[in-house]
Amino acid sequence: MNTFRLESHLRDYLAQNLGLFSLPDAGLALYKSEDGTVRGVEFQTEVGPIDILAVAANGTLYVIELKVSRGADATVGQVLRYMGAVRKNVAKGRPVFGVIVAAALTEKLKMALSEVKGKVFAIEYELKVSLKQHGHEV
């Protein structure tokens, strides 16, 4: 098995390792409200919770939607809804992009993404674990 068992595990790992993302804008950090009370993990909107809301060093906002297994084409509509909510309530004129992270991208998802090229990015993740023996030889 090379996927996360629970979406919350993937979310927590990526929220702590936003530097792993290779996106057009550098310096991703978790979104924080101006008063610091709202964080970008499970960010609540009127259309549902966003897995991760991140902001780049230049202020660009990224709506990150996670799928622990295969990303379905319906995920594109979900991300677009979230992007609309962020644009309406948070962005204050800043650019908003979407990111779908999944263990595998289906052909239907790739087809749907072809219509929002440059606005929604898709990333496949791969889980790897390696162990190194140190200390006592057996």
Residue ranges and their predicted role:
Residues M1-V138:
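Charged, terminal alpha-helix-loop-beta segments
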